[in-house]
């Protein structure tokens, strides 16, 4: 089969700081598909990953390249900012077999307010959305539409605006569950996320010195915990009610109960580590999810830790 993989940072070169993480995910997927006998192509604005065939693209032509090349491929998978993913997945699905989420599911996940409401209606624990700050409490502020820890802050006060949402801050372990969603959901691993809090005196709330930027800096895969079953059950329920399909990363803060803080309807950076400890090929699993029946479980051996700095060293130079 011929597989199209589109990763936004690599394909557009718009935000160079995101290229290492994007290239790591792209290379991981491309190498996996190639190892099991498939042909891979990917849009690139200059970054080479050493696997598959690069298709010349730019910030202006990325969408057109996806639409054009999808017609010549048997299947495709896209990684893009949450706000762009629904439309890109629509274009992909109209031209080939989409191995990822439907446009509708991607849109539900992209809207952090709507996503939280869906989860809570389904009885899944998620941090409460807060309209007004109370003295002595901490809150997480993030864009209503955004990716991961992008423009996310821990604050002691905030102004309520339509662009950002505020939620209660939950103390606990910062984890994620990586899984393949579909008719037969397949949990892959629990991952420990390395989250850094950097105090800032400006930014989203310049008059409040108690502002900390929240930064994701890699993960450990797998993370062994006696509550793995509870975490898997929570993640599977979340993707079920959101209607996700394909590779999904569910961010969870594990406190007295698991709290779902974000659902990423696309491959996430954790895939870089998972591919190094999982015996099965992620590419084959994604195709089987679309065209066949997934196994009951996967085999994981050893552990792997990476940081964003490490990805920068590996993929920071074209």
Language model: regions and residue ranges:
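Flexible, glycine/charged-enriched surface loops at secondary-structure junctions
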Residues: 245-251, 295-299
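ATP-dependent carboxylate/phosphate-activation module, predominantly the ATP-grasp catalytic core
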Residues: 167-243, 254, 264-291
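Conserved N-proximal alpha/beta basic substrate-recognition cap immediately N-terminal to
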Residues: 42-128
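Conserved protein kinase catalytic/activation segment
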Residues: 257-259
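Short catalytic helix/loop segments, enriched in acidic residues and glycine
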Residues: 17-33
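Nucleotide-activated donor-dependent transferases that construct or modify glycoconjugates
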Residues: 1-18
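Peripheral (often C-terminal) accessory segments that flank ATP-dependent C-N-forming ligase machineries
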Residues: 75, 285-318
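ATP-grasp fold ATP-binding core
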Residues: 119, 136-152, 163-172, 177, ...
